[in-house]
């Protein structure tokens, strides 16, 4: 296509949009942002010549690799420890992808720029493609992996699981609240521009090291589209910056979006990379090292900092606090321990840790053993049924954590937990920023300005409250996490498939599960103060 014909085609596509003159359009997806002074910029023109042929070629490579993996016996070589965590990961990730596709009409409706609508429409096609190839990857794993249990229930399990619902909260953030907050700042400016680096670049590297070369093929195909999505987000960001009235909203949304992405994405991807791998080479990058390179340097220093020249206040404090939580406060390791504590209500198996694992963690995170080593030794000791309860019900010096109302990841850095009465309910938050998000950001007014489109953080946000007072065996049965024999649990605290060493419903029966939040709201003020003080001091029950 010649340059002249490309320009004509681009102009013709732009003419396909119109503003109705016979009626006032209904605002389906509202925003508190204003775009009266916004400049026009269309990212689509740069790729219009080659988009569909390019995507076809990428799909051919993905599905060809899937066929090659089966013919090449990849599943005889891949590490079980790695693929077990993919049951959780691949149950979650298609949902944020399809939510991103659903977010594009929100952005199109909110941004009065027919030119940029073209790029957003193409992004919607991308996101549908991403979700499709990820679902196909999951199906291929299910059909060929030695233990398909868990892969066969992911769409149901992700929606009712204590970990999967965190991912659901993350994906729903793309399509709820203010349209620009959700579909642009939270999704495109932060999630796609920053955190897809660890998600779609660093994680595939770890997959390959564990014998899985399918996930890198699929996710590099996904990541190659992200540069265009980043361009869409940046275009809308510049449009918003053109109007000074948007600056407080942008600064609010950057704080919320950065922190919620950190809380959820770093929790999940950090755990998959650090605890799902068998590759313990000393020269392999830890998640902290990956984060410093891919997010701190490539995103914060290269993308966020230059925005200050437009007068925008960047959340430097939150970036530094996220780094501190990963490096000094053991955030990823706390998440992994929490997931392993909840193994009876998992739909994936979690491997025990070995001396090689211990040595690697101590090398990469000095002091790791003194804080986490003894617990993982107890996890190994309590891995098989018969003489003990699941580790969550044994005395191993670990108190089941409170859930954060905002990000829904538990308050695992216990000294930072915030407890406040909001909307008539005592709620717990993992951090001051998550409390601010619920009590200040997602409200009908912000800094004296009406913000009716932000919405509220509502619903059953604490998984534990849904199962308060139930027997553990009944919870597992209600969730449907039972294998085909009707008695053996899908989740196991080891990778041994010997039926004699796998936990059954009878093995976990007799243990009553209680919700920390329900109990917190039942306490007197003095009891609550004492409980919170003990929790912050290290998690020993008051």
UniProtKB/Swiss-Prot annotation:
Alphabetically ordered keywords of this record: Iron, Metal-binding, Monooxygenase, NAD, Oxidoreductase
Cofactor binding note: Binds 2 Fe(2+) ions per subunit.
EC number: 1.14.13.227
Enzyme class at the top of the EC tree: oxidoreductase
Disruption phenotype: Cells lacking this gene are unable to grow on phenol, acetone and methylethylketone (2-butanone).
Induction description: By acetone. Transcriptionally activated by MimR.
Needed co-factor(s): Fe(2+)
Superkingdom as given in the UniProt entry: Bacteria
Binding, Fe cation 2: 127, 192, 226, 229
Ligand binding (Fe cation 1): 97, 127, 130, 226
Task of the protein: Component of the propane 2-monooxygenase multicomponent enzyme system which is involved in the degradation of propane via the O2-dependent hydroxylation of propane. Also involved in the degradation of acetone via the O2-dependent hydroxylation of acetone. Also able to catalyze the oxidation of phenol, methylethylketone (2-butanone), 1-propanol and 2-propanol.
Subunit structure of this chain's protein: The propane 2-monooxygenase multicomponent enzyme system is composed of an electron transfer component and a monooxygenase component interacting with the effector protein MimD. The electron transfer component is composed of a reductase (MimB), and the monooxygenase component is formed by a large subunit (MimA) and a small subunit (MimC). Requires the presence of the chaperonin-like protein MimG to ensure a productive folding, resulting of a soluble MimA, which leads to the active form of MimABCD.
Official protein name in the record: Propane 2-monooxygenase, hydroxylase component large subunit
Lineage: Bacteria, Bacillati, Actinomycetota, Actinomycetes, Mycobacteriales
């Amino acid at each position: 296509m010649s340059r002249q014909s490309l320009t004509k085609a681009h102009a013709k596509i732009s003419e396909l949009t119109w503003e109705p003159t016979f009626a006032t359009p209904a605002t389906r997806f509202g925003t508190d942002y204003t775009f009266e002074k916004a400049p026009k910029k269309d990212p689509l023109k740069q790729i219009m010549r080659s988009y569909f042929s390019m995507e076809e070629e990428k799909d051919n490579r993905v599905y060809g690799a899937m066929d090659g993996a089966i013919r090449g016996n990849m599943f005889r070589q891949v590490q079980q420890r790695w693929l077990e965590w993919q049951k959780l990961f691949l149950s979650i990730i298609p949902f944020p992808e399809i939510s991103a596709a659903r977010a594009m009409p929100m952005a199109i409706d909110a941004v009065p720029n027919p030119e940029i609508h073209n790029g957003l429409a193409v992004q919607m096609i991308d996101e549908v493609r991403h979700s499709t190839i990820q679902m196909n990857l999951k199906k291929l794993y299910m059909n060929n992996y030695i233990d398909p249990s868990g892969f066969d229930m992911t769409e149901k399990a992700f929606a009712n699981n204590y970990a999967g619902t965190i991912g659901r909260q993350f994906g729903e953030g793309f399509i709820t609240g203010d349209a620009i907050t959700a579909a642009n700042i939270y999704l495109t400016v932060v999630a796609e521009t920053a955190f897809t680096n660890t998600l779609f670049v660093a994680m595939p590297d770890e997959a390959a090291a564990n014998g899985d070369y399918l996930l890198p093929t699929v996710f590099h195909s996904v990541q190659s589209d992200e540069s265009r999505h980043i361009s869409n987000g940046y275009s809308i960001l510049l449009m918003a910056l053109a109007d000074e009235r948007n600056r407080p909203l942008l600064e609010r949304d950057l704080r919320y979006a950065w922190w919620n992405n950190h809380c959820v994405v770093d929790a999940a991807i950090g755990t998959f990379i650090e605890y799902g791998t068998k590759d313990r080479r000393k020269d392999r990058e830890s998640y902290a090292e990956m984060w410093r390179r891919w997010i701190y340097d490539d995103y914060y220093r290269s993308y966020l900092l230059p925005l200050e020249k437009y007068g925008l206040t960047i959340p430097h404090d939150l970036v530094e606090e996220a780094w501190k939580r990963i490096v000094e406060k053991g955030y990823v390791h706390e998440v992994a321990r929490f997931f392993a504590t909840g193994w009876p209500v998992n739909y994936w198996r979690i491997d025990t840790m070995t001396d090689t694992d211990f040595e690697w963690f101590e090398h990469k995170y000095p002091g790791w053993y003194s804080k986490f080593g003894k617990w993982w030794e107890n996890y190994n000791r309590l891995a098989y049924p018969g003489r003990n309860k699941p580790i969550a019900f044994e005395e191993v010096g670990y108190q089941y954590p409170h859930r954060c109302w905002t990000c829904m990841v538990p308050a695992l850095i216990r000294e930072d937990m915030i407890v406040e009465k909001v909307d008539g309910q005592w709620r717990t938050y993992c951090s001051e920023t998550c409390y601010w998000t619920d009590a200040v950001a997602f409200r009908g007014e912000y800094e004296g300005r009406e913000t009716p489109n932000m919405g509220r953080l509502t619903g059953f946000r604490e998984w534990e409250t849904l199962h308060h007072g139930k027997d553990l065996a009944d919870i597992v049965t209600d969730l449907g996490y039972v294998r085909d024999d009707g008695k053996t649990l899908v989740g196991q605290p080891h990778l041994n498939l010997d039926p004699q060493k796998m936990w059954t419903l009878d093995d976990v029966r007799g243990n009553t599960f209680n919700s920390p939040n329900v109990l917190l709201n039942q306490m007197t003020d003095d009891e609550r103060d004492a409980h919170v003080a003990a929790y912050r001091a290290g998690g020993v029950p008051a």
